[in-house]
Structures are given as C-alpha cells and as structure tokens.
C-alpha cells in the first residue's frame, strides 16, 4: 500500500478582510507573487489556489460579458503559472449551502444565497467560523457540487464555466485536493 505524506500550508492572501484587491487579475498577481517569493514549485507537487466569487454587479452595462472577460484573462494568467482557480458563483456561500441541499436555482447575489443558507445556519455571518457546522457534511457538499456541475454540462454549458453559469462552484476540487 501507499503511505501518503501531506504537508499542507494554507495561506490567505488578498482577502477583503485584509484590505486587498479581490478582482480576478489582482488575486492571480498576488498568487504569482506569493508563489515566486516562497519558491513554490508545481513540478514538485506544490499547488497554489485562488478562490474567487462571481460577484456580478448588475448595475454595470453588460455585466456578465465584462466579468467573463476578466475571468478569461485571469485563467490564462493562472494557467501559465500553474495556479488553480476555484470559482463559486454567485458567491462562496453557495459552497456552504451545498453542505445542506442540492439546488440549481439561480441566485442573483450574496444576499439571495445567504437567505437560503440561514435556513440551515440561522446565525450565519460572513466573517464567522462555521467549520464545525459544515465539516460533517463535506462529503454531501462535494457530491452536490458535482451534481450541479453535471446539470450545467447537460444543459449546454461547457467547462471551464463562466459567470453566466449560476449557481456553480468548483470549490470541491480544492477540498478534494486537501483530503
């Protein structure tokens, strides 16, 4: 049998709470900077992930196309450096919701997802620690995220999914890489 050794070092760079810019290109630039500064080597099994929300501002003209263009540029930059992007659309909290239910319902924004999430986590706050409430449901969340992905693939979307694919999250890929 194979003995798996894991050395996981998770760093959060460029989060809103740290005052960092959170647009896709800025997140990738910060990841590249971190990767270079810390001599992270994809060829030696290291990985760098950028976790991003859809965060569509529907007040902008043609918001989906504008956001998709930025995402496409970020993906090209990330691919060139071996960086993975985990997207959650419309927001990260959709991943949390999948711990409790499967849904393909369109969610316009964070408040819409939070409203659904509070059915299961009534006191949910964005900066709160919900790990203990979610941990035992991780396998369900992974299964539900894969089902959402299959739903979109069967409905004429193709990977990598863009911002028009809502709801969606591939956070499960990051989580599976840590398990």
Language model features by range: what are they?
Residues 2-15, 32-49, 54-179:
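C-terminal accessory helical subdomains adjacent to catalytic cores in phosphodiester-
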């Amino acid at each position: 049998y194979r003995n798996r050794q894991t050395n996981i070092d998770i760093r959060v760079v460029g989060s809103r709470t740290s005052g960092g810019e959170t647009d896709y290109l800025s997140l990738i630039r910060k990841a590249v900077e971190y990767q270079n500064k810390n001599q992270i080597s994809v060829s030696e099994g290291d990985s760098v992930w950028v976790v991003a929300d859809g965060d569509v501002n529907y007040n902008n003209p043609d918001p989906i196309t504008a956001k998709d263009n930025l995402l496409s540029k970020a993906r090209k930059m990330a691919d060139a450096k071996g960086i993975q992007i985990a997207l959650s659309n419309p927001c990260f909290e959709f991943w949390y919701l999948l711990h409790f239910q499967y849904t393909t319902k369109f969610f316009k924004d964070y408040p819409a997802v939070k409203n659904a999430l509070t059915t299961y986590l009534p006191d949910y706050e964005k900066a709160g620690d919900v790990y203990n409430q979610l941990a035992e449901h991780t396998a369900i969340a992974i299964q539900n995220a894969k089902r959402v992905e299959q739903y979109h693939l069967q409905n004429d979307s193709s990977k990598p999914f863009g911002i028009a694919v809502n709801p969606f999250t591939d956070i499960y890929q990051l989580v599976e890489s840590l398990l």
